[in-house]
Amino acid sequence: MKRSNHTGKRTILYLIIAVVALMPALVPPAATAHETSAGSVSHHARGSRSVVSSAVLAEPAVIGSAKAEGQQEIKQPARSRIAIIVDDFGNDMRGTEEMLELPVKITVAVMPFLSTTEKDARRAHEQGFDVLVHLPMEPKQGKPEWLGPGAVLTRMSDAEVRKQVEAALDNVPFAVGINNHMGSKVTGDERVMGIVLAVCKERGLFFVDSHTNYRSVAGRMARKIGLPPVENHIFLDDVHTASHVVKQMRLVQERALNQNYCIAIGHVGIQGKETAAGIRSGIAETKDSVEFVGISELVRDEWQWNSQLTPP
């Protein structure tokens, strides 16, 4: 009897050991981080780029990709970006050289029908900078002589508005778009802005609302016809000192880091050298945390803008 009991206990012990050894095969593995981190990949409202959370530790399959079996490489998100537009080129204004010598990409907005319009546009293009037509547009207030030649006015007929816009585009080579010089009255006028935007669309261009009018209809109307609603966020030189421009550049950096990008506007002109000096100092402070790009690159990525540009 003792031998039988001893043998039975040994058999039970062997069975327990066998069950323990088989347990890893019977219990399903824990889920990986990317399967349990809901919302760890979030898309910006513009639909341009993805921000991948640090919680995503494993590489997920990409549905619909040719490399859907875990072979798709996840790119790290690009740095926040800043596009600086410098207005009022075209008349050899003070600060022109200093702006063109800045150590990052800028966008050069050139007024049409002036003494150095073509020269400034060509030089900017040759240096790899984007060019915009800085189109004079009627303001609510201000002296008419501030507008310059070729201005778009609300009293013009539809045909006259179209003629002015097309002539300005023909006068500024290499333009990828238009932004408004002054224009607080025009950008609030649906009829006139409808014509301006229609010409932009016909030519494969976009419109940058300088935001001289907080009741501007430009963005809303651009969306309606399939154009990107691009707008200025911060004026750098609303106070004409280099120290103020540096402060504004810090605001630009803050917005870019919080919102993924920022568009800012400065000017050549009476205080153009001071503005350029402030921008240069601001670049030195911010260049390690953001990327400076031309407006066309920003528009292409943020709004998936792939329209074919009309050659000069």
Where are these regions (language model features)?
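C-terminal domain-boundary segment and adjacent tail
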Residues: 200-213, 271-312
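Second-shell loop/turn segments in exported
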Residues: 83-85, 89, 105-111, 148-157, ...
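Alpha-helical scaffold elements lining the catalytic groove of polysaccharide deacetylases
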Residues: 146-170, 187-192, 219-256
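Hydrophobic faces of well-ordered beta-strands that scaffold small-molecule active sites
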Residues: 82-86, 104-110, 131-135, 178-180, ...
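Basic- and aromatic-lined ligand-binding clefts that recognize polyanionic substrates
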Residues: 179-214, 218
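Terminal interaction modules at protein C-ends
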Residues: 2-80, 249-250, 289-296
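Active-site beta->alpha N-cap acidic-glycine motif
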Residues: 75-145
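Active-site groove signature of glycoside hydrolases
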Residues: 166-186, 261, 265-267
